[in-house]
Every structure is written in structure tokens, then in C-alpha cells.
Amino acid sequence: MNNQKQQKPTLSGQRFKTRKRDEKERFDPTQFQDCIIQGLNETGNDLEAVAKFLDASGAKLDYRRYAETLFDILVAGGMLAPGGTLADEVIRTDVCVFSAQEDLETMQAFAQVFNKLIRRYKYLEKGFEEEVKKLLLFLKGFSESERNKLAMLTGILLANGNLSASILNSLYNENLVKEGVSAAFAVKLFKSWINEKDINAVAGSLRKVNMDNRLMELFPANKQTVEHFTKYFTDAGLKELAEYVRNQQTIGARKELQKELQEMMSRGEPLKEISMYVKDEMKKNNISEQTVIGILWSSVMSCVEWNKKEELVTEQAIKHLKQYSPLLAAFTTQGQSELTLLLKIQEYCYDNIHFMKSFQKIVVLFYKAEVLSEEPILKWYKDAHLAKGKSVFLEQMKKFVEWLKNAEEESESETEEGD
């Protein structure tokens, strides 16, 4: 048996050739720019030819290294200096976004050029996003027409999914906001975005990157109100965006109201103070009584640890709700609010199985405490109830509803006798 270790082959002296398809011509940025500009100029503004040229050039030129230069040229016609002006003594091309016609159709055609390029060379995605973030910070260095074209193009690319809505962060730059550049740019951007998709798709993209609650920041701090935002964007023809932001603010205000209510209740603050706070919030954020009664109900029900035994939970619930009846009564001044509360009670008792037998007792308590009145209860019983557990709850309410109807008839006959 041979105990000698076999010598492993070494690679010294070996030279490996790069496969021809992996070779890239090594240029400095200026040489790279010259090659791209020369090729673009030869296309004669034919964007189909531009897309083909860019596709073919990626095999020879180092797009990965010079992505910024490539995108500068395609947008502005040449390499950009800090601030957004074209670098001194550079050659430039008119086959670019900034030299194109200022209309949606042309920008859609340019968007296709970027789309094809990025789909062909996936590694350019990140570089392109960084480029757009940079261009947005340079907005003050561009003319109004150049900004408009960039805004339209960006909106289309956002709609196509070539860009993430996180690029909008650049628009919150203090100087751009202060001078009104951000808001004006956003108008053009959102118009083209909504034109390609719709407000629901836009909202989804904004939500994905937690940008849905930040649109107010397009304005200086002293103008960050729903009223100002709504007027500005409605006047600019973007009513759907204005309504979306108004709804977002209302949703935010509701969440804040619920959170504060739960804290006030857990601290045991007087009902009078809670009522005053709620009324102020309703006025300030334009929240309806129907919405408020729903928030109050869920806050009241979530501020206590419920007994798990069905036979004990009803007694506990009645005691707890009796305490909060005056507060609830203050926000059921309309029949629709009473009906909303009835539906919330039904839903709660169905979703929390220990409360299935408590429904009728809660309704009777609220009737006696003048939180609920006859008409909404009868309407709920007749045709306004939910499907959830309806057979159980209607059966529970049968006798009480009959009593209400009899009481109503007696009251009517007494009135007639009096007449």
C-alpha cells in the first residue's frame, strides 16, 4: 500500500481567457458617454431604434459601472453636475426626455424605452431608482417644462411597477417643499399615475412603502391641513387624490380617538370629560355620530377583562354597561346612530360566544337608559338586522318587541282618546 500523499495538481502558470460574451469594453465615464450619445444620435429620435440600440449596447458597454451616466443621458441628454445642470464641456444629445415633446403620449413612449432596458438588464433596477431619487432632488435646477416631463414619466413608471413609491421621499426635501416645487411636481406625477391606473392602485402602492399618510408633507408645516391639501389638489383637477387624503386623515383620527378613549377609560376619567373630548374630536376631524358610536362601543367593551363563564358574563356586562350608558346616550341622538349601535351589539355578541345569551338584556338595559328608542329597535327587528346569529337574537327579542308594539298601540289609543 502506497502511504505517500498524492500531489494535487496546481494551477500555476495557467491563464484563463474571459469568454468573449463576458468581455466589456473598459471606458472612463466620458468615453462611455460618447459611445451612448453617438449611438442615440444615429437613431434619429426613433424610440424603437433607441430601445434596440440600448439592448445591443449592454452586451459591449459596462452598464453596471456607468448606470448613473446612462440614465443622466437618457433623461437630460448628458452627464449632470451636482444641482442638476449639464456638466461643463460635455457633448449632449437631443434624444432624451428633456428634449422631447411635453405630452403624455411621448412620455409613455419613453417609459417603454426604460421598461425594456430594465427588463433586459435587471441589475439596472436599483441604479434607476437611485437615479430618479437624485433627479427629484435636482428639480430646482430644471426648467418648468423639464420638470413636467419628468413628473409625467415618473407617474407612468410608478404605474407600470418600474419604480417603487419610496422614490417620493425625495419630494419631502425641505427646500423643494418650501418653494412649492414638490407640490407642483406631485400634481403632474399623480395625474399621469392615475391616468395609467386608478386611485385604488395608487393607494396600494403608497401603502406598501408607508407613504399613504405622508402626502400632507408636500406642503410646509403651516399649510399641512386637510383643507389646504383638498383645495390645492381639487383645483388642480385631482379630486380623487384629495378625497383619498381626506379619508386617510379621518381613518387616522378614528384610530387616535379609539386609542385615547381606551386610555381615558382605563384611567377612570369622568364621563363628562370623555364626552367633551369626543365632541371636540368629532368637530375637529369631521367624524359622524354613527362612526363615533361604533368607536365608543368597542372602547367600552375592550376596557374590561370579561368572565369566561357564560352564566356570569351577562351580569358583569349589564353592570359595566350601566355605568357607561350616559356616555353612549350622548352620542345616539339620531335614529341612524341607534341602529348602528344595535348592529355593533349584535356583531359583538355573535363574535364573542359567551355573549350569545346577553344580547336581549343589553338592548333592554339601553332602552331603559334611553340610549336606544322604540323605532330603531323595531326597525332592527323587522329588516335591519345582520345575518350573524339572527335566528338566536330575533328569538331572544320576540317578547320585548311584542311588548314595545303593545306599548306603542296603547300610547296611540290614549292620544286619540285625549283628542
Swiss-Prot record:
Biological process terms from the Gene Ontology for this record are: regulation of translational initiation
| Name of this chain's protein | eIF5-mimic protein 2
Renumbered residue ranges of the record's region Disordered: 1-26
Tell me its family: Belongs to the BZW family.
**Pfam families assigned:** HEAT_5MP1_2, W2
PROSITE patterns named among the record's database cross-references: W2 (PS51363)
Q: Which UniProt keywords apply?
A: Activator, Transcription, Transcription regulation, Translation regulation
Please state every residue range assigned to the domain named W2.
247-414
Which gene carries the instructions for this protein? bzw1
Composition bias, kind Polar residues: at what positions?
Answer: 1-15
- What does the function comment of this entry state? Translation initiation regulator which may repress repeat-associated non-AUG (RAN) initiated translation probably by acting as a competitive inhibitor of eukaryotic translation initiation factor 5 (EIF5) function. Enhances histone H4 gene transcription but does not seem to bind DNA directly.
Organism this protein belongs to: Xenopus tropicalis (Western clawed frog)
Domain of life the protein comes from: Eukaryota
The cross-references to InterPro entries, in alphabetical order and at most eight, read: ARM-type_fold, eIF5-mimic_regulator, W2_BZW1/2, W2_domain
Q: What is the lineage of its organism?
A: Eukaryota, Metazoa, Chordata, Craniata, Vertebrata
